Design a protein with these regions (language model features):
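Conserved, function-critical positions that sit in or immediately flank catalytic
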Residues: 24-29, 33, 37-137, 147
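Short beta-strand-centered aromatic/proline hotspots
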Residues: 18-23, 106, 149-166
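Charged, amphipathic alpha-helical scaffolding segments
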Residues: 224-261
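Short, solvent-exposed secondary-structure boundary/capping segments
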Residues: 28-30, 69-70, 115-117, 158-174
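Short solvent-exposed strand/turn elements
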Residues: 35, 164-186
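Extended low-complexity, serine/threonine- and proline-enriched intrinsically disordered segments
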Residues: 43-49, 87, 135-145, 203-222
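Short, low-complexity cationic-aromatic patches
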Residues: 77, 124, 200-221, 242-254
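Boundary/junction segments of secreted and surface-exposed precursor proteins
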Residues: 1-17, 25
């Protein structure tokens, strides 16, 4: 096989950019923000738990230019509240009130999973099936302050409305990395599915069985060992655990991994 060593950077779009108030152990506390509806009222900057979920996925169905329903492909997990559903805008029409109307949907959560997505406005002007984006998924927090530690990042383990808890597997002293009022960004993490595609025809690598499919070798946490993954045409699989769907395996930024084909 042909091998190539590559890496994936952080996603470019930031879910949040702001300053921290304080650090305690692995917990970073943030300032409240003016509420959008009432600027005199302080509001928390985050939705509780949303930065540490397994993101749900869904596909829209379109009939006669309208989004008629949304089918859940994966329920996700870890949701404390219903996530926001974003449906991409229509591709035809000229008037946003007549023939180019955005579709709107809302999610229901039960047992920390997205169990239903209800279309409350089908929209108009959809000649194709629009992409449905569901809020959530794993996130990284990165220091963007001009500092010797600039660029350091950590996976978010959990979050409340104004606090995040970082995964600190090396037991670093975060007080020395994140100082009061330091500027940070929170960005979505890549997963095998979001980086290489969840299923055909969107896959960027060849699917197949353990011997015929392209492989992705990801480094194990705090180890020099690499674990092999491949797509079998249905889902991503991890060698040694073929019954499990590995599509939501996190791909760490700026860490080398190996592609074999």
């Amino acid at each position: 096989p042909f091998y190539k060593v590559v890496s994936a950077g952080l996603k470019s779009e930031a879910a949040f950019r702001g300053q921290i108030v304080s650090v305690s152990d692995n917990n970073l506390t943030f300032y409240t923000l003016p509420d959008l509806l009432d600027p005199t009222y302080p509001a928390f900057p985050f939705v509780s738990g949303m930065f540490a979920t397994t993101r749900a996925r869904a596909t829209a169905k379109v009939i006669d230019g309208n989004v008629t329903s949304i089918v859940i492909d994966s329920n996700g997990s870890g949701y404390l509240k219903p996530p926001e559903i974003r449906i991409h805008p229509p591709d035809s029409g000229t008037d946003a009130t007549i023939d180019a109307v955005d579709a709107i949907a809302v999610a229901e959560v039960n047992g920390s999973k997205v169990t239903a997505i209800n279309v409350i406005e089908g929209g108009r002007g959809y000649s194709y099936v629009p992409y449905v984006e569901i809020e959530g998924g794993p996130h990284f927090l990165r220091l963007v302050e001009e500092d010797p530690n600039e660029g350091r990042f950590f996976l978010i383990e959990s979050n409340s409305g104004n606090q995040v808890t970082l995964l600190n597997s090396l037991n670093l002293d975060l007080d020395t990395i994140f100082k009061p009022d330091a500027l940070v960004e929170i960005t979505p993490a890549w997963t095998l599915g979001s980086l290489f595609g969840y299923k055909p025809p969107m896959l960027k690598l060849k699917d197949g069985n353990e011997t015929t499919a392209d492989r992705v070798y990801l480094g194990e946490t705090n180890s020099t060992n690499y674990q092999a993954y491949f797509h079998d045409g249905t889902a991503w699989r991890r060698e040694g655990a073929l019954a499990e769907d590995a599509s939501d395996t996190i791909v760490y930024p700026d860490e080398a991994f190996i592609l074999a084909r």
